[in-house]
Each structure stands twice: as structure tokens, then as C-alpha cells.
Amino acid sequence: MSFHRYRPRLPGGELAPMPWPVSLYRVLNHVAWPLEAESGRWTVFLDRLMIFLGFLVFCEHNEVDFHYLIANRQDMDNMLTGLPTYLILVEMQIRCFQLAWHKDRFRALLQRFYAEIYVSEEMEPHLFASIQRQMLATRVNSTVYLLALLNFFLVPVTNVIYHRREMLYKQVYPFDNTQLHFFIPLLVLNFWVGFIITSMLFGELNVMGELMMHLNARYIQLGQDLRRSAQMLLKKSSSLNVAIAYRLNLTHILRRNAALRDFGQRVEKEFTLRIFVMFAFSAGLLCALFFKAFTNPWGNVAYIVWFLAKFMELLALGMLGSILLKTTDELGMMYYTADWEQVIHQSDNVGENVKLMKLVTLAIQLNSRPFFITGLNYFRVSLTAVLKIIQGAFSYFTFLNSMR
């Protein structure tokens, strides 16, 4: 099945380079990653069948995780041991299978990204290097999430050493799951759920980051081209033609700007619900993780690593959102400082000067509002929103600690 999963290509037809977290996301997560557009009917049917079975597995895990919380509702410490895995399970079930429902739309977005937006290292080495620096936090976060998963996968090792039969996560089954014919398949399902959840966590973050930072680079490129066009025309064009040439260049730049904004809106449409769900669960998840890490650090190393991973994920996404917001906000000011007044001063064509001033006014109006990604229009993805979530999480922690 992995051979039929979509592999992005550049406009020339060659395979597009993908960062290692996205490549790993593609390999590990058959639920979220789309198939190739030309996949056969049986391949599509088998993929949908696997998604349906995966959904049932998530429902089963949801049930037994919740039973653990109910069984330990009188013991806050034990209940909070199982709460983080339950919260992340519910969050990922919503995000992952919502994406699975819209796989074709996601593939179309990736196709457009690599066809129109992607900044290659060969064409723009400086911009590409800047993107890699901006994405460094998401790469580190991917490594930390894998370390968090590894901590859970140490459970089978301790099972062998201490002759126990414990699941990877805190779960209560309505039957004796320690019987070998139940235990082994259930443990395998635990592993599968762990891979799907972890790959979704770092994979989607890196996909969003790539889309946002390459879009950001295109906006930077747009501003550079606008400034260069005025400088070149002032040096080369005659006083009669300079306004005409600049107006044509400005029209072309405005069309490029509209195309970039349209792509940004497509990104917003694709991710807005999943971002909302991510942020909605984050405060409670951070609170529970920090509580476990704070109350027993040496006994909850997995929770400490997981807390760091979640904390870094939110900060990385907020930082990328703030970068895009800042760039598009500055783009509105760019039209004020694009030397159009020098073009009008040099031009002797009064009619074209009037048309140019009207076009500049339109450009300023169109770019008066910066572009930003939101969570169902409730909040902007930015460091400000992330800091509010972190503040809320620590407020909940203070309350829980006082209850203890």
C-alpha cells in the first residue's frame, strides 16, 4: 500500500525533496496521507477499508482508556496518569480521521504547493536557507516526539524483565486482557495507535510549517520584485513610458499577490478545524502532563519528554504563524515605499499617472489586512495565542496542585 501513497513532484516531473519528518509521516500514517491520484479502484477500496478498521481501533482504545479514568475517578493521581493519553487519543481521532475524510483535498493542496509556491534550493538558495532555519524548531520537535514514543515502547521490555503483562497505556478492559491470546494482539494495536498518533503530531506540524514558510518566502520575494521594478524603470525607461511600464509591473505583482492570498486561504480551509481542535485540547493536556512531571519527576520521565514535545510544538507553530503575520503586515506598507511617487515625478504622461495612482490606492486597500491562519476564526495562530494557552494550562495546574 505504501507504494501507492502520494509522492509530491515538482513542475518538471521530478520527485520533490521532503524533509525527514514529512517523509516519515508519509510512510507511517496510512490513515492521513493521501493516495496517488491515479490509484486503482481496488487500491482506493482497500485504503478506505483500512481507515475504517483504524477508526474502530481508535474507538476501542477510547473506550478502555475512558474506563480507566472512570475506575480511578476517586484517585486523582492515578486518574491524571491516564488523562494525557486519553486526551491525545480523542484529539488525534478527530484530527486524523477528519483529514482522512478529506484526503483528496489535501493531495490537491500539496500538488498546488509544489507547482506554484515551493521555493527550491537551486533557484533561491538564500530564501531556502532561511526557510530551513525557520523550520529548525519543528525538526527538533519531531525528534522529541519520537523520544516520547520510545519511552512508551519501553513497557514491553519491563514486561519481560518483571514478568508482567501491562499495556503501553493506562487501560481497563471488560475482560481479562492478560491472557496471551488477547494480550499480544491488543499490544500490537497499542503499538499501531502510538505510531499513528505520533506521526500525525509531528507530521502535520511539519507540513503546516512547510506550507506557511514557503508562502512567507513568496511574499518576501514579491516585495523584493516590487522594489526592484521601480528602481530598474527609473534608470531605463523614458519619461513618457515609465508610468505605463510601472503600472503593468504593479498589475502583475498584484495578480501574484492575489494568487498567494488564494493559496493561503486554501491552507486556512484545510487546517482551520484541526488547528482549533489542537489548541482546544492543549491547555488541558499541558496541565495534566506538567502535573505528573512535577509531582513525581523520576517516575514520569515519559510525561516530562511528552510535555516538552507538546510545549515545543505549540511554540513552533505560534512562531511560524507570527512570522507569516508579520511579513504580510509589512507587505501593506511596502506599497507606500515602492518609489511610485518617483515614477510619477519622472513621468510626463498625465493620464497614465492618474491610472497609476488609482492602482496604487487599490493595492494599498487590498493589502491593508495581513494574512494569518486561524482556528475556525476564533483565534490567530501566533505566539500571542500560544502564550495564552500556556498561561491557562499553568492556571489549571495551580488549581490541581492545590486540590492535591
UniProtKB/Swiss-Prot annotation:
Signal peptide: none annotated. Coiled coil: none annotated. The keyword RNA-binding does not apply. Pfam families: 7tm_6. It is found in: Cell membrane. It is a multi-pass membrane protein. One of its GO terms (cellular component) is dendrite membrane. It comes from the Eukaryota. Its main location: membrane. InterPro entries: 7tm6_olfct_rcpt. Residues 60-67, 163-181, 296-303, 402-404 are extracellular. The chain crosses the membrane at residues 39-59, 68-88, 142-162, 182-202, 275-295, 304-324, 381-401. One of its GO terms (biological process) is detection of chemical stimulus involved in sensory perception of smell. Keywords: Cell membrane, Membrane, Olfaction, Receptor, Sensory transduction, Transducer, Transmembrane, Transmembrane helix. Residues 1-38, 89-141, 203-274, 325-380 are cytoplasmic. GO terms for molecular function: ionotropic olfactory receptor activity; odorant binding; olfactory receptor activity. Interacts with Orco. Complexes exist early in the endomembrane system in olfactory sensory neurons (OSNs), coupling these complexes to the conserved ciliary trafficking pathway. Belongs to the insect chemoreceptor superfamily. Heteromeric odorant receptor channel (TC 1.A.69) family. Or1a subfamily. Odorant receptor which mediates acceptance or avoidance behavior, depending on its substrates. The odorant receptor repertoire encodes a large collection of odor stimuli that vary widely in identity, intensity, and duration. May form a complex with Orco to form odorant-sensing units, providing sensitive and prolonged odorant signaling and calcium permeability. Involved in the behavioral responses to octanol, anisole, and 2-heptanone. The atypical heteromeric and topological design of the odorant receptors appears to be an insect-specific solution for odor recognition, making the OR/Orco complex an attractive target for the development of highly selective insect repellents to disrupt olfactory-mediated host-seeking behaviors of insect disease vectors. Odor-evoked OR currents are independent of known G-protein-coupled second messenger pathways. This is Odorant receptor 74a. It comes from Drosophila melanogaster.
